[in-house]
Amino acid sequence: MKRDFAIAGALWLIITVIGEALVLLVEFYPAAQSDKGEEIESAFRLLLILAVPVFALVVAVLLYSVMRHSTGDTPPEDGPALHGRGLVPFIWLGVTSGLTLLIIIYPGLTSLSAVISDESNPDLVVEVTGFQWQWQFTYPQQDINIIGTPDDIPEMVLPVERSVRFEITSVDVLHSFWVPAFLMKIDAVPGMTTIISLRPTKTGTFLTDSMLRVQCAELCGLRHSTMAAHVAVVTEQEFEEWVADQQALSAGAEQPTPVTGAQEFTIVSEDSLFDVDEIQVEASGQVVMTFDNRDAAVPHNWAVYESEEAATSGGAPIAGSPIESGPVTQTIVFDAPEPGTYFFRCDVHPTTMTGVLEVR
């Protein structure tokens, strides 16, 4: 019996050493790039360190029992029963109970509270809105609004080593806000706002690290797999320059003044559909298009292209409005193009909100 314990113990020790070496030396997960991610990574590593000896003991006893007591094809009769408990079950119960208590306290209570804690006075607030099938990022302090489309993947820009508070919601179905590099994920729920706070700890962009992306992690419909956005973590100076560029871009987007006698039309979007699918205008003169987006909190725009092929291949529109969430009314002023048939659409919903512009 002592020999059995010695061999099984030696086997357990060998498996434990190998397992602990793998845990300590091999990176099983991508490196965390946020303070909360580092807390999560530390908790997982501790759980693995504590789990390896328990797992190794089960494997060692199982392997030794199979090898030691193998009888081939003809098992003997049952041996005599073993009576009494001995110390081993009590030691096993004490060790596993102690490990369980340790895990409940740390990382259970301490790490969990650190990860879910909210930053009451963050350096930056980003309002994140999910919709089928893209993301909208609003920086209320900087008056910046970025809305993605299937053909124009948005980029969320964050300053490194600054606390960021994400206020997350959805306008249609359940989505999930997940940035793999930050090791953080939370649902975007219609009608409510969920919050996570973190501090990015490393600069980088999606072009150099594919983990720096916002990915919807909740099956949300036909184009769920395409619901992604890029993330860039930059220095404080680069972030300030980006903010200035975005604000200048918004300030410079001004419509020309309509002239007397311009052709005037109105198109309405409601329930993510245009109220008309064909518009006719005269080739000469100016066109004033009023776009009325009546869908609350849903982003739309109106843009006209040379053709449907030009729109789907990334061509620039002849005219169009910026993407904005409703309810909102926009005015688009442009010179009528040459006679012909043109294609218009909502760039956010390019398969369901389309139509034809006939220029005569």
Located regions from the model:
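Alpha-helical transmembrane segments of integral membrane proteins, especially early/N-terminal helices
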Residues: 4-25, 53-55, 60
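Non-transmembrane, membrane-proximal soluble domains of secreted or membrane proteins
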Residues: 2, 22-44, 66-304, 313-315, ...
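C-terminal structural segments of small proteins and small subunits
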Residues: 342-348
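Alpha-helical transmembrane segments
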Residues: 41-57
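Residue-level recognition of secondary-structure-to-loop junctions
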Residues: 200, 336-337
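Sequence/structural segment immediately N-terminal to covalent heme-attachment motifs in c-type
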Residues: 211, 337-341
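Extracellular beta-strand/loop-rich beta-sandwich domains predominantly from IgSF
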Residues: 329-334
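Transmembrane alpha-helical segments in integral membrane proteins
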Residues: 55-71
